[in-house]
């Protein structure tokens, strides 16, 4: 392995966090390929090919040739979330080119949820749950003393490519315009000054007349923006995971109303939902934040850093390639090289903060075991006494019923006497005589 190299098939790898987040720790020396891939001869010292480019003919053709020879392992990197329109409604994307199937030996997925979807496309045994190394340094504390109590800062963001044709762009523009119109009518919301922070792409900011007149490359880093806001609205994008990872209440902004591979606790799919959703983002219910956190752990492997898993996966693939070439056999791989993250996801079952989920229920506010034991003992004692008390009350009720029966009989007798007297004097009785008891016991 000492003489082998890892070849990255991406011209801009040295400036992309998809690669720079782990390249310096690579178990093999890294070489970035900037040649035209269909004409690129695979070097003899290639220990592994790594790329996230899996869309165009150039990459797919080069990957297929190497994959068919089955001597040099290919690792495909997932660079973010799956987006429904990008998969199925992208007019410039060749049908089936998005991992249907994967043209490689393994795909480094960002989470279990993504792995399940891609495996359903005919990729059994190819998906490894790695995570996103570039997010390893994101703080998950959710605490920021710099945030103001009288100001609500809401980030409105779009994906780098929010639309794939003119019709989709029109819908995206409609959605962000609806947010702007709503904010203009609500400068103060829920007793707090509303401040929108815009992070739009595809020329939407100047078209709306929002944001700063700054070139995209000169913008404040997204990580710093996320650290300064209270909540996030975003079109389908990996921004969602970056936001949720920071424990920010986060909603999808999707007027396309497309299926979502990642479920969100909040979604705005029409303008009449803005007020109610933003109201909850400003004061998020605990149960929705718990659901948001649950989805995060399913969609992003983040219980432990992703970089060590990626490096382990690279080493495992390189070893398998070496063994195949030494023995003149095809590369053979287990269905899972990495098992830790999936096992961790299955084992996770941390207790919930029941008091936070039900803030209005004072019963759950008491977490003193001794006090709870005393109250439970008293409750058990009280329950033991109840059958005797109920028996006494039943006796008293039976006595009252007998007294009521006697009173009813006296009233009936008096009524019949009055009727008889009226008849005797020729006066038509107001009511006929009562025959028997008008009321009967339930028994």
Regions found by a protein language model. Give the residues of each.
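Active-site and donor-binding regions of nucleotide-sugar-utilizing enzymes
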Residues: 7-138
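Conserved catalytic-core segment of nucleotide-activated headgroup transferases in glycan assembly
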Residues: 19, 135-207
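Short loop/helix-cap segments at secondary-structure boundaries that form the rim of catalytic
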Residues: 19-20, 41-43, 117-121, 205-212, ...
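Structural loop-to-beta junction motif characteristic of Rossmann-like glycosyltransferase folds
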Residues: 72, 231, 247-251
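Donor nucleotide-activated moiety binding/catalytic core segment of transferases
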Residues: 198-246
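Catalytic binding pocket for nucleotide-activated donors in carbohydrate/polymer assembly enzymes
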Residues: 238-302
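C-terminal amphipathic helix plus adjacent low-complexity
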Residues: 283-391, 395-405, 409
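Helical coiled-coil/dimerization "stalks"
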Residues: 388-443
């Amino acid at each position: 392995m000492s003489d082998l190299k890892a070849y990255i098939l991406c011209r801009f790898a040295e400036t992309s966090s998809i690669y720079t987040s782990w390249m310096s720790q690579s178990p093999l020396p890294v070489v970035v390929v900037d040649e035209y891939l269909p004409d690129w001869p695979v070097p003899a010292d290639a220990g592994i090919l790594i790329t996230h480019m899996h869309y165009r003919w150039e990459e797919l053709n080069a990957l297929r040739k190497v994959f068919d020879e089955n001597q040099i392992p290919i690792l495909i990197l997932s660079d973010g979330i799956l987006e429904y329109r990008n998969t199925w409604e992208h007019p410039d994307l060749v049908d089936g080119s998005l991992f249907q199937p994967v043209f490689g030996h393994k795909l480094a997925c960002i989470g279990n949820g993504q792995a399940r979807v891609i495996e359903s496309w005919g990729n059994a045994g190819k998906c490894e749950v790695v995570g996103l190394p570039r997010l390893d340094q994101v703080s998950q504390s959710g605490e920021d003393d710099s945030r103001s109590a009288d100001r609500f800062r809401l980030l409105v963001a779009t994906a780098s490519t929010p639309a794939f044709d003119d019709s989709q762009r029109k819908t995206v523009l409609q959605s962000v315009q609806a947010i702007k119109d709503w904010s203009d009518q609500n400068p103060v919301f829920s007793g707090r000054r509303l401040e929108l922070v815009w992070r739009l792409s595809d020329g939407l900011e100047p078209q709306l007349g929002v944001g700063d007149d700054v070139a995209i490359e000169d913008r404040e880093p997204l990580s710093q923006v996320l650290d300064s806001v209270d909540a996030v609205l975003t079109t389908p994008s990996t921004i969602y995971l970056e936001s949720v990872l920071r424990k920010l209440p986060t909603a999808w902004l999707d007027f396309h109303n497309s299926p979502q591979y990642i479920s969100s606790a909040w979604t705005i799919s029409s303008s009449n939902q803005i007020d109610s959703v933003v109201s909850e983002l400003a004061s998020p219910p605990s149960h929705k934040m718990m659901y948001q956190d649950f989805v995060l752990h399913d969609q992003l492997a983040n219980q432990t850093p992703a970089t060590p898993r990626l490096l382990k996966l690279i080493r495992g693939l390189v070893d398998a390639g070496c063994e195949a070439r030494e023995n003149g056999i095809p590369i053979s791989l287990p269905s899972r090289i990495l098992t830790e993250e999936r096992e961790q996801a299955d084992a996770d079952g941390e207790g919930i903060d029941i008091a936070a989920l039900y803030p209005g229920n004072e019963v759950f506010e008491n977490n003193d075991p001794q006090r709870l034991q005393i109250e439970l003992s008293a409750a058990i004692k009280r329950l033991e006494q109840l059958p005797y008390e109920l028996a006494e009350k039943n006796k008293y009720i039976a006595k009252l019923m007998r007294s009521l029966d006697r009173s009813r009989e006296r009233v009936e007798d008096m009524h019949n006497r009055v009727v008889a007297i009226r008849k005797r004097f020729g006066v038509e009785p107001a009511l006929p005589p009562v025959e028997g008891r008008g009321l009967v016991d339930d028994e």
